[in-house]
């Protein structure tokens, strides 16, 4: 299949708008510039649209196997494509956990069979993510594991994390950490702060996260391992990562859209669509996250897309599962809040969602270049619409942003040269 | 009892030698200047001697109760006085541990009955220092606990340390931490480095210490607790403390003479007198400790005086207990190495052993001032002698410095107005 994306504009190195047509042949970009259509290619009229590299989200939960009621690889991938994502990395906290070569191969096949975007599967660090016994890293790497993580739970002992880091470093893979010290959770369902006190809820103190990061950056230094911090959420964590980077430690970090956009004081009431892990923190934490993203302490944005059924979320704050969806709302929310109404440049936002995650993990995606994978997202920056969870292609409707009006929506997504999503008005 | 210390010289604010006589009446200094003897006072001729504030060592092991073969409060105090120390803080890893009001009162009485210097007893953080259950901080404070520590073992769970810090902060006491993650000890008896590899010994990696400090400074920040790091030994630990101080966290740290003087490459062979915990680290670690002391990251020097019987130490490296004595060798070694043959000023060294520990813990000692406690040490900076463990007043002879020639020896010590030690040629 061959496409010619005509009349759109791209952002150049300096973030300036530049008119450019893009030719896609098979899975790759084969030409960029002023191009005329050839016979056997489908023209996509991108007039007035931003032609962006496909977004990259290195933290999604597709729930398959075992949680198909919440999401499947197929529905998750469709949601990603609709959100403009062409590459996602799927967390291993499924049932079963991909902690063996066979399990990983099953997931890979499932991706091949059902996914419309590139899905990079994480393998778990420990068997069944219980934290006691390490998985076979070498075998899992061979089976295509993207990196290793027990996301959803923290690695509780330093010794286990240190051994995992040494093993990961030996096979040039990253350790990706959900940072949570179980002895500091206190049965909390929200951040230990204004909201928890006002509502008589147990709160999860910021140290629950920051102490693991502080531990792990030292272990990563000693093991010379690439250590990546999932969903960073506290100002102290940002400081620890900043100091670690200053010391030359190979640490990267991601932040979620919801932690950039909301803090605990924004939680309107006991609405479980505002319950995620880590929780929404204080205004000072949110400010520190934004500052950390802007000064490079935090490397990129990742949604931590975590679908649950409405039934699961339809209970009290203490009992509801943690997590919200994010793939289909990330760009509109972030563009509206930080670019259109904020101080970020468009390029900054695009980079946080494309090239930055790829640079952090050495992935050959996230840019528009001849010869590179044809991962392309067309964005209508003028389009205004209200977030409507009923239109989500994700099975998960658990979002706190339902009803919010946003500007700037992805309207078509080409993943590895295939049209993965399109609002039905572009392709001729 | 009243003393007049005549003809000695003291160091003024700028570290300059100044002739000054000092009158001691009862427990306090009552006059400093050009003084003439009165009838009923004993004159101590301090001609040619440095008259220093008494040294303060906030980390000693006096082994009583339960370890009287190694040391008693009495013998330890005598060793302290001989080393020029007038105040010491005694660690609670005795048998039994002072983890109740009654035990603490027993120790206090023992100190009153047998000690010739001021001994401030630590109480333990957890019952029997096992790490599971917190002691009654309020009761132990009432019984005179100086601060709280489980020295000898690390507090393994963040939750326990956090609760302890909150409790200590509430009663304005410090948490003093032996930083050691049990999951990172690997059965090591020396530092994981050159010496361990050359001798086929399990090594204790630096992260074993540094990860606890990194955890604890964040907990201390959240709990607003004074957190003190015992016997800091690694370059990463110095960096973590430096960053924490920069962030305004109430952390202080001590370093031992042996970690300033020796590294693992100095260990001549399988000599258990070079075995202590934390172990002697790399040359780079030693350099970082010196730098950290000089730039204020590390607050003061403490010996971690840890006597063992010669029988206990007379075994293989793996089996011997950790620890060396230090009270009777600290000043001569440090003065010789860092002042006489080094770049430190005399005042720097004296401050690290007197006012700095007192400032860190708010103790009213460590200076020569009218009205202050008469804690005074006379030092012959010209005296040259060889360290001879057989002359030690400590029961412990376990030192790696035996036979080393040093210059600069304490020759008399007045503790709270009483002559606690004197070489027999001064008092008239």
UniProtKB/Swiss-Prot annotation, chains A, B:
<feature type="binding site">
    <location>
        <position position="59"/>
    </location>
    <ligand>
        <name>Zn(2+) 1</name>
    </ligand>
</feature>
<feature type="binding site">
    <location>
        <begin position="322"/>
        <end position="323"/>
    </location>
    <ligand>
        <name>substrate</name>
    </ligand>
</feature>
<comment type="pathway">
    <text>Pyrimidine metabolism; UMP biosynthesis via de novo pathway; (S)-dihydroorotate from bicarbonate: step 3/3.</text>
</comment>
<feature type="binding site">
    <location>
        <position position="277"/>
    </location>
    <ligand>
        <name>substrate</name>
    </ligand>
</feature>
<dbReference type="GO" id="GO:0005737">
    <property type="term" value="C:cytoplasm"/>
</dbReference>
<keyword id="KW-0378">Hydrolase</keyword>
<dbReference type="InterPro" id="IPR011059">
    <property type="entry name" value="Metal-dep_hydrolase_composite"/>
</dbReference>
<dbReference type="Pfam" id="PF01979">
    <property type="entry name" value="Amidohydro_1"/>
</dbReference>
<dbReference type="InterPro" id="IPR004722">
    <property type="entry name" value="DHOase"/>
</dbReference>
<comment type="function">
    <text>Catalyzes the reversible cyclization of carbamoyl aspartate to dihydroorotate.</text>
</comment>
<dbReference type="InterPro" id="IPR032466">
    <property type="entry name" value="Metal_Hydrolase"/>
</dbReference>
<comment type="similarity">
    <text>Belongs to the metallo-dependent hydrolases superfamily. DHOase family. Class I DHOase subfamily.</text>
</comment>
<feature type="binding site">
    <location>
        <position position="151"/>
    </location>
    <ligand>
        <name>Zn(2+) 1</name>
    </ligand>
</feature>
<dbReference type="InterPro" id="IPR050138">
    <property type="entry name" value="DHOase/Allantoinase_Hydrolase"/>
</dbReference>
<dbReference type="GO" id="GO:0008270">
    <property type="term" value="F:zinc ion binding"/>
</dbReference>
<dbReference type="GO" id="GO:0044205">
    <property type="term" value="P:'de novo' UMP biosynthetic process"/>
</dbReference>
<feature type="binding site">
    <location>
        <begin position="61"/>
        <end position="63"/>
    </location>
    <ligand>
        <name>substrate</name>
    </ligand>
</feature>
<feature type="binding site">
    <location>
        <position position="93"/>
    </location>
    <ligand>
        <name>substrate</name>
    </ligand>
</feature>
<feature type="binding site">
    <location>
        <position position="231"/>
    </location>
    <ligand>
        <name>Zn(2+) 2</name>
    </ligand>
</feature>
<dbReference type="GO" id="GO:0004038">
    <property type="term" value="F:allantoinase activity"/>
</dbReference>
<feature type="binding site">
    <location>
        <position position="61"/>
    </location>
    <ligand>
        <name>Zn(2+) 1</name>
    </ligand>
</feature>
<dbReference type="GO" id="GO:0006145">
    <property type="term" value="P:purine nucleobase catabolic process"/>
</dbReference>
<feature type="binding site">
    <location>
        <position position="178"/>
    </location>
    <ligand>
        <name>Zn(2+) 2</name>
    </ligand>
</feature>
<keyword id="KW-0862">Zinc</keyword>
<feature type="binding site">
    <location>
        <position position="304"/>
    </location>
    <ligand>
        <name>Zn(2+) 1</name>
    </ligand>
</feature>
<feature type="binding site">
    <location>
        <position position="308"/>
    </location>
    <ligand>
        <name>substrate</name>
    </ligand>
</feature>
<feature type="binding site">
    <location>
        <position position="151"/>
    </location>
    <ligand>
        <name>Zn(2+) 2</name>
    </ligand>
</feature>
<feature type="active site">
    <location>
        <position position="304"/>
    </location>
</feature>
<dbReference type="InterPro" id="IPR006680">
    <property type="entry name" value="Amidohydro-rel"/>
</dbReference>
<comment type="subunit">
    <text>Homodimer.</text>
</comment>
<protein>
    <recommendedName>
        <fullName>Dihydroorotase</fullName>
        <ecNumber>3.5.2.3</ecNumber>
    </recommendedName>
</protein>
<keyword id="KW-0479">Metal-binding</keyword>
<dbReference type="GO" id="GO:0004151">
    <property type="term" value="F:dihydroorotase activity"/>
</dbReference>
<keyword id="KW-0665">Pyrimidine biosynthesis</keyword>
<dbReference type="InterPro" id="IPR002195">
    <property type="entry name" value="Dihydroorotase_CS"/>
</dbReference>
């Amino acid at each position: 299949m061959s496409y010619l994306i005509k009349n759109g504009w791209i952002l150049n190195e300096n973030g300036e708008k530049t008119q450019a047509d893009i030719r896609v042949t098979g899975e790759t970009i084969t030409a960029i510039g002023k191009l005329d259509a050839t016979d056997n290619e489908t023209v996509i009229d991108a007039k007035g649209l931003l032609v962006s590299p496909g977004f990259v989200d290195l933290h999604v939960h597709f729930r398959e196997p075992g949680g198909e009621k919440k999401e499947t690889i197929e529905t998750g991938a469709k949601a990603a494509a609709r959100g403009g994502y062409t590459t996602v990395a799927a967390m291993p906290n499924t049932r079963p956990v991909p902690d063996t070569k066979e399990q990983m191969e099953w997931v890979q096949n499932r991706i091949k069979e059902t996914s419309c975007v590139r899905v990079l599967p994480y393998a778990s660090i420990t068997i069944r993510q219980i934290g006691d016994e390490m998985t076979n890293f070498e075998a899992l790497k061979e089976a295509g594991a993207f990196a290793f993580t027990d996301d959803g739970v923290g690695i509780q002992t330093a010794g286990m994390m240190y051994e995992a880091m040494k093993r990961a470093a030996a096979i040039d893979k990253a350790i990706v950490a959900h940072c949570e010290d179980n002895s500091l959770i206190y049965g909390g369902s929200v951040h230990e702060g204004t909201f928890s006190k006002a509502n008589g809820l147990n709160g999860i103190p910021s140290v629950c996260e920051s102490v693991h990061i502080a531990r792990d950056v030292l272990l990563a230094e000693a093991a010379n391992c690439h250590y990546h911090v999932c969903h960073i959420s506290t100002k102290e964590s940002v400081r620890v990562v900043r100091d670690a980077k200053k010391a030359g430690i190979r640490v990267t970090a991601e932040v979620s859209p919801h932690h950039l956009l909301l803090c605990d004081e924004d939680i309107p009431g006991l609405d479980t669509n505002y319950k995620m892990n880590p929780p929404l923190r204080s205004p000072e934490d949110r400010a520190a996250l934004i500052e950390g993203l802007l000064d490079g302490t935090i490397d990129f944005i990742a949604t931590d897309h975590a679908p649950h059924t409405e039934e699961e979320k339809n209970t009290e704050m203490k009992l509801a599962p943690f997590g919200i969806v994010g793939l289909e709302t990330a760009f509109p929310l972030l563009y509206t809040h930080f670019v259109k109404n904020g101080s970020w440049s468009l390029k900054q936002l695009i980079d946080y969602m494309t090239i930055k995650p790829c640079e952090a993990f050495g992935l050959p995606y996230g840019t528009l270049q001849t010869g590179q994978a044809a991962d392309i997202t067309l964005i209508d920056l003028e389009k205004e619409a209200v977030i409507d969870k009923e239109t989500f292609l994700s099975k998960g409707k658990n979002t706190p942003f339902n009803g919010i009006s946003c500007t700037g929506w992805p309207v078509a997504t080409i993943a590895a040269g295939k049209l993965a999503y399109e609002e039905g008005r572009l392709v001729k």
